[in-house]
């Protein structure tokens, strides 16, 4: 994307045109996410939770900026090593410490703290939250965001915090409850 390529504008009105939801419900959903920093959308499979979550993020960002939205899907084998960091085998033998998708996205959001970033987790109920988030589980709460609540990571003793400009949208199927 060059400096001359403008991203498509995406507003609350665009969201209402694209997603089958009442204006009052959109306002409530948007306000709740901005205040709490975390929400879970639930519904039957195939109703458009992923579509809605991405568009909710774009409507808050104000444009369809895919660089500020990360999407992953949990499963029963998803782990802290995939999500935050862990040792992975190298092709030439041995192991190396690799940072996970959540760690990298948090760092990206921290380096651009005046913008909002959205981390969308599909099938959030299929993963073991304690196993995946580890010591970061507390840090996703709104009251524990930011540098003043940083903690030391298990694998490398690095201090880490979940940035205040990161919003998490989890999704789950009601059939899985």
Language model: regions and residue ranges:
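Extracellular interaction modules
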Residues: 1-5
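AAA+ P-loop NTPase catalytic core and its hallmark functional loops
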Residues: 6-177
